[in-house]
Amino acid sequence: MPRLKVTQVRSGIGGTAEQRDTLRSLGLKRLRDTVVKEDRPEIRGMIRAVAHLVRVEEVE
């Protein structure tokens, strides 16, 4: 199954509480934090909600 490398590139400060909670749910706590997640619809939805704060790459 493909995986997604998600890196936080912008701060959650100034965003809504929902956006900050979504970053935390993805496992991102500070700038330049990177996590690798399975490519699933739930994860894609969370990424879409904070797309302006993260960078996403597909990895094998």
UniProtKB/Swiss-Prot annotation:
GO terms for cellular component: cytosolic large ribosomal subunit. Gene3D superfamilies: Ribosomal protein L30, ferredoxin-like fold domain. GO terms for molecular function: structural constituent of ribosome. The keyword Ribonucleoprotein applies. The keyword Ribosomal protein applies. Signal peptide: none annotated. Keywords: Ribonucleoprotein, Ribosomal protein. One of its GO terms (biological process) is translation. Pfam families: Ribosomal_L30. Belongs to the universal ribosomal protein uL30 family. HAMAP family: Ribosomal_uL30_B. Part of the 50S ribosomal subunit. PANTHER family: LARGE RIBOSOMAL SUBUNIT PROTEIN UL30M, MITOCHONDRIAL RIBOSOMAL PROTEIN L30. This is Large ribosomal subunit protein uL30. It comes from Acidothermus cellulolyticus (strain ATCC 43068 / DSM 8971 / 11B).
